[in-house]
Curated annotation (Swiss-Prot):
This is Guanylate kinase. It is found in: Cytoplasm. Its EC number is 2.7.4.8. It is an enzyme of class 2 (transferase). It comes from Streptococcus pneumoniae (strain ATCC BAA-255 / R6). The lineage of its organism: Bacteria, Bacillati, Bacillota, Bacilli, Lactobacillales.
Length: 208
């Protein structure tokens, strides 16, 4: 039976570039892990593909899945739901395949309670001015919504201590490489691999 895969939880403030860094990781990486597509009730943006960038669902459909207990995590953010389908994640991990979750900070904290041995990576902007420029540059939100996102970002950055790693997105390729290095190192963490060496360990404490 294959070892259970590694659950990688990747999050950060809105506009920090999570999706861009994630795409860079998957396009340039030889690591064998699977991207878990999140589900959301927000409007589909130009260029986004249902089932690739997100599963786009109505609010009613999403709330029904919550009632059925079919979400690993979910959160409501600026009037929209975001979440991770549970069945897909467990089936993939059980096959020994690493699963990469790109989710909101609220959702990441829910996952930490349920899967404390997951790897939690927080992507940060260089500073708040740069974050605001990125949000404005997207051209998808009103000034009021952008202001809400900046205030929310401050709250989320304050939760960075709940994560295992913090990586600044000052340049996409560098940020992606840093994330890949973290994932590679986690595969050799003693707590994760010690089970393979049980037969080499003494059966009982030795005395002199």
């Amino acid at each position: 039976m294959a070892d259970r895969g590694l659950l990688i939880v990747f999050s950060g403030p809105s506009g920090v570039g999570k999706g861009t860094v994630r795409r860079e990781i998957f396009e340039s990486s030889e690591n064998q892990f699977q991207y878990s597509v999140s589900m959301t009730t927000r409007a589909q943006r130009p260029g986004e593909v249902d089932g690739v960038d997100y599963f786009f669902r109505t609010r009613e459909e999403f709330e029904e899945l919550i009632r059925q207990g079919q979400m690993l995590e979910y959160a409501e953010y600026v009037g929209n739901y975001y979440g991770t389908p549970l069945t897909y994640v467990n089936e993939t991990l059980d096959k020994g395949i690493d699963v990469f979750l790109e989710i909101e900070v609220q959702g990441a904290l829910q996952v930490k309670k349920k899967v404390p041995d997951a790897v939690f990576i927080f992507l940060t902007p260089p500073d708040l001015d740069e974050l605001q420029d990125r949000l404005v540059g997207r051209g998808t939100d009103s000034a009021e919504v952008i202001a809400q996102r900046i205030e929310k970002a401050k709250e989320e950055i304050a939760l960075m201590r709940e994560y295992d790693y913090a990586i600044v997105n000052d340049q996409v390729s560098l940020a992606a490489e840093r994330v890949k290095c973290v994932i590679e190192a986690e595969h050799f963490c003693v707590d994760r691999v010690i089970g393979h060496y049980q037969e080499m360990l003494p059966k009982s404490p030795t005395t002199r």
